[in-house]
Amino acid sequence: MTRFQPILLGSDINVYGMARAFHEEYGLVSEAYAYFQLSPTKFSRIVNVHIVDDFNNFVTFRNFMLKLGKRMKAEDPERVLLLIPCGDVYANLLSQCGDDLREYFVYNTLDVNLSRRLAYKSTFYQICEQYNLPHPKTRTVTADEVKAGAYRDLPFSYPVAMKPANSVEWLNIDFEGRRKAYIFNDPAELETIIKRAYDAGYTSEMVIQDFIPGDDSRMRVLNAYVDQHHRVRMMFLGHPLLEDPSPVAAGNYAAILPDYNEGVFRRIKAFLEDIKYEGVANFDMKYDERDGEYKLFEINLRQGR
């Protein structure tokens, strides 16, 4: 077997999960690099976390990774350095690097333009329209439209769901009542939170959607791996049993039961291969009893948590 070293980007539960998988299968201790230490990996013996100042800045990230790769290759030229982004910020940074790091690392990434279109929720729904992928009815509003009160004119009734189109920018926004995503039962609730968000400095679009009825038992999560030739090699569907109840982690699952749906697999496989995807993809979806369809909420360009 080719000798390799996992290099993980981040310090969250995704990093711990990947490190645990590598340790259980190969007995390896992973090396992780992040701009902030999170609790899941803080005291772990199966992953060494290195904190790098300003590591979420592209120039800092690229320069550091080039130096790291050069040093590690010099130490052991025959060892493969397997680079895996485990968070949205790092997946975005790696896509911006393109092929710049391939002299030292082996990794999958997307063309930066495709990466941005998929990661940004409003453009992801446009892509869903092109590929006839079911998704909730959606109204996207800009900062200027929020000032003009456009969020009051929705093409669907309450309750509604709301989430930021730019999840990376949202990480740096703080205000009373901040959550990863919202469900509003009346217009007053929506107006209060959307105004607070933009007053706190959020600048990107906000996505407001028709709420799909039913509790979390209707949710499904799909993970797929697509190789460098844009062929789907693995797909796994899960039925979430327990969701993280904390406001900033809504949508993160603590327990998932394996599931199977051939129709969902066929549709997602055709989509990923047609857009020439590469790497790991994670989809959140919910079953809509009104039309019998699984509606896509988003794609994450990384493993699911």
Predicted regions and their residues:
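Phosphate-binding site of ATP-dependent enzymes
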Residues: 184-244, 259-266, 287-295
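Oxyanion-binding "anion nests"
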Residues: 247-250, 257-283
